[in-house]
Structure formats: C-alpha cells, structure tokens
Amino acid sequence: MRNLLGGKGANLAEMNLIGVPVPPGFTITTDVCNEYFEKGKADVVSLLKNDVEKSISHIEGLMGLRFGDAENPLLVSVRSGARASMPGMMDTILNLGLNDKVVVGLAKKTGNERFAYDSYRRFVQMYGDVVLGMKPVNKDDIDPFEAIIDSVKAKRGIVLDNEMNVEELKELVSLFKAAIKERTGEVFPENPVDQLWGAICAVFDSWMNERAILYRKMEGIPQEWGTAVTVMAMVFGNMGNSSATGVCFSRDAATGENRFNGEYLVNAQGEDVVAGIRTPQQITKDGSLRWAKQQGISEEIRAAKFPSMEEAMPEIYGQLNALQDKLEKHYHDMQDMEFTVQEGKLWFLQTRNGKRTGTAMVKIAMDLLHEGEIDEKTAIERCEPNKLDELLHPVFDKDALVKAKVLTRGLPASPGAACGQIVFF
C-alpha cells in the first residue's frame, strides 16, 4: 500500500481503519506521478478528471459541504507523500477553494471574518509560492510575500502576524495578488477547480525540485518511486482560542527516552509551529517546565504566557496522549505526528516513523525490545550502521553538564561534544 499511496497516504488510510480521527480525503497514486513525467500534464489531467471529480463529491457528502460553494464551502489541502519520508523537501497547499466570493461566505458561515481572511491570505501566499513559482530559491533571496507582510506590520506598528486585524488581512490578500500579477504575469485563479489542478500538478512537479533531488541522492531514494498526492478536507487550527496546531513525538528523538513531547500553537495553522514567527508552547507540563528553565523564564510568566497543552487544553491533551500511544504500539516504532484542533475537536494529519539521532536509535530499539514490541532481529535491523558512528564521538559528562553554566544554546551540526573557535555569521 505504501508503494502506491506513499507514506502519508498509506498511514492516513491505516489511521482511519484503526479509529484515529483523520479528515476525509483521497490519494492519487505514485504511478500517476511517473505517468505525469512520461506523458505530460495535459494527458494525465484528462485521465484523472472524472476520478477526481467523483472523489471530491464523496468528500462533499461526508462533510456536508460543497467545493466552490459561496454559502457552504468545502476547502481542501493538497499534500505530497513519497513512500520514503522526505521531511521538508516536498510541497503542501492549504485552504484551497477560497476566492473573493467564497471567503465572504466562509466568514458569514463561521461568524469569524478574521479567520476567513487569515485563511485566504495564507492560501494566496502558498499558491503563489508552490504553484506559481514565487518561493525563494536561495537562502539570501527576498521572499516577496514575507516582505509585504513585514511592510504592512511595520506601517501599522504590529509585531506578530496574529495581531493583524481583518482590514490588514484583506490588504495582504490584495497586495499578494498584485505581486503575483507583477512577478509572474498571471492572474491568481478564482475558479476552485483550476486551483485544484494547479496544486495537484505542482506537487508532482515538486518531486523534481532541487531540494527533493538532492535529498533523494543523499538518502538513496530512487527517482522512479515518485510521489503520491493526498487531497483532504481542511480542518482549521486558526479558528480561535479553542483551536490549535502542533507536532509531537511518542519518544524523545534526541535521547530516545520514553517521553511524549512536542510543540503546539493556539489559533495557528500549518507551518506556523516551525516557521519561527511565534514561540510555540510545549505539549506536556514536564516539557514546558524544562523549556522555561532552559530559557530562564519564571514560573509565573510560563504559566501565564506559555502554558503546556496538558494545562491549557487538558481534555484534548488526554486524547492526544492516548492516541500517540496507540499509534506507537500499532507501528511498533517511535512516531512523529502532526495534528490540528478545530474548535475543541482533535484531528490527526500525519504519522510516520520519526527521525532520530544515533543514540536515540539504539535506545529506542533496545527499549522496544524489552517492552515486547519488537524481536531481537528487528532491533538489530533498526540500528543503521552509518549512524552507529555517532556513538563513538566524545560527549560531555552528564554530571558536569548539570554543574556547568550555560552561556547560550544552539543546534548541533555534528555528533558529540565539540570545542574550538566561535564564528559568528
């Protein structure tokens, strides 16, 4: 199933079968991706047209919504999913189906105009980036959309994106569309069907983008595997303070400890958690306390401004904790999960076997063996030879670390402890 549906599509189907809440959707197989590059866009769109229309109708029936309808709109996400996990390499588009008429209907239906226009400006930005090719290629390239956002915030004296009001979000939509026209010569498509096909083809195209090609070479992933495309009904983490989005791990990916952990943001969507525009909060109270200690934040400020999900949304946390345990036991491995909470209802958007350090790799394999989740042969197979080298590097003594005075923190660029000259860049 994974070979055809990709890791994401296969795991979504499997989660649905075992009772984990996932939004309804459908997956276009990896075989179609290969045909896309062999036969061309026009032939593949023609071949898929009827099947995609039927699948959208099926989602409409399950959700009680209509794709492209101004009064009761169905919005969808379009996501890539190769059979091997390729985090961050492929493209995703959220909130697809919005246009100038649908956004008005969405605002009226939800009674939340800010949510509707926040979703719209995100969609226009993603569509411009992914489908119309406006995403910066190099690190130093200026992102035209982020430059517009920064300009609007500076003009209004705003610091954070979530402080923008409805009028400012409407202004962003207008400025984004003008930037698309100026840079690409194309008009942002108002027809949701055109948007859908643009997104599906863009995800197939992302299989051959520079990032994906380099990652495949590094990881030994064959080009002919292709990517699947998963189209799902949207669920929204940006509908207010009872909504959220987050990522979590069933065990510690750095140390391998059997410790549920992760981050979330209230009233946020998609990549906000990892984008750096807001400080994410920790899933567990224990994790929140450790984070606050590392950051030098008092308990009073932590509890008031950065409470854990366990404290702020105890019922949702209980469901999330139970389901992450269920998924780890189902897959017999540490899981990396993405979720959204829409007005108090939890939805899972993805699960996959989590990436881990060499130290965590060995500890997780041995712990799962002792817990009876895997056998000795599987435990040995889980220990990748190229990662065992990480265990041979010198490390700091744990007792010395406890006593040491921390000057600053950063992300390790290599395994083990290191000493040398500090270079600022």
State what each model feature region is.
Residues 1-408:
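Nucleotide/phosphate-binding sheet-loop regions of phosphoryl- and nucleotidyl-transfer enzymes
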Residues 412-425:
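Long, structured protein-protein interaction/assembly regions in large complexes
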